[in-house]
Amino acid sequence: MAAVDDLQFEEFGNAATSLTANPDATTVNIEDPGETPKHQPGSPRGSGREEDDELLGNDDSDKTELLAGQKKSSPFWTFEYYQTFFDVDTYQVFDRIKGSLLPIPGKNFVRLYIRSNPDLYGPFWICATLVFAIAISGNLSNFLIHLGEKTYHYVPEFRKVSIAATIIYAYAWLVPLALWGFLMWRNSKVMNIVSYSFLEIVCVYGYSLFIYIPTAILWIIPQKAVRWILVMIALGISGSLLAMTFWPAVREDNRRVALATIVTIVLLHMLLSVGCLAYFFDAPEMDHLPTTTATPNQTVAAAKSS
């Protein structure tokens, strides 16, 4: 009996000695086998894992979604589904605008700025601002061209707002839709390394139109040479952005098909800019005061009455 007591006393003494020598050691309570091991405060072994838990969150489902790289998406008929397309901050919008104004050769706008997070906030407000910039600048240009003419009566043309809205929004949505369908069709025949979603294409087209906002404001200057220089600069910047963005998506295709696709994209973009300049600025409608001319019968009647 004494030998057993001595053995138990020696184990307790060894444990106490070990804890004294290494206070950070892991201890387990024998009376509660279901309890998990406890670490002493200040243990460096668990600090890294705790920091990861703080970054990823304590919810296991959130960790699984983050590790899988996927988020739960709401049904398309709910408000939350469309809210994700406007989930961008001011820095992201300004960064994408800056990227559209300064396209870098060899850099992909989608991979560099959008990064699989396309938004509709920027394209929507860029198109809305461009609509009013074109309509208001067109009316002011018409007014300045005929300023000082006694026979000219200025009448604001509010219908230019609706016409500009139809043109801009149709271009910003229908052209990307057609391009997306074409790229999907070609990808079924030729496997391309780079592929874009419909929202990514809409996002690229929306931000590519930002350069036309200051251009439309400067179109107020009643000089055709200045206007055409401005439109060529804007077309060169935005057109190069579109060409450099969509060339990787068709590069693996047939050479003629790839070149024809890029040329078509640039030509449609040119048609938009030149068409807006020609319709809203270069062809102002004349609205003179009505003038009356005396007919021979009226002259004879006036002479008889006198």
UniProtKB/Swiss-Prot annotation:
Comp. bias regions, Polar residues: 15-29
Keyword entries, A-Z: Endosome, Glycoprotein, Golgi apparatus, Membrane, Transmembrane, Transmembrane helix
Name of the featured protein: Protein YIPF1
Family under the similarity heading: Belongs to the YIP1 family.
GO MF annotations, alphabetized: small GTPase binding
PANTHER family in UniProt: PROTEIN YIPF (PTHR12822), PROTEIN YIPF1 (PTHR12822:SF4)
InterPro entries: Yip1_dom, Yip5/YIPF1/YIPF2
Cytoplasmic side: 1-119, 184-200, 249-256
Membrane disposition: Multi-pass membrane protein
Subunit-level organization: Interacts with YIPF6; this interaction may stabilize YIPF1. May also form a ternary complex with YIPF2 and YIPF6.
Ranges of Acidic residues composition bias in the record: 50-59
Transmembrane segments: 120-140, 163-183, 201-221, 228-248, 257-277
A Gene Ontology BP annotation from the UniProt entry: vesicle-mediated transport
Residue intervals annotated with topology Lumenal: 141-162, 222-227, 278-306
UniProt region (Disordered), positions on chain: 14-62
Protein location: Golgi apparatus, cis-Golgi network membrane; Golgi apparatus, trans-Golgi network membrane; Late endosome membrane
Carbohydrate-modified residues: 297
One GO cellular component term noted in the UniProt record for this chain: Golgi medial cisterna
Keyword ATP-binding appears in the UniProt entry: no
Pfam family, one: Yip1
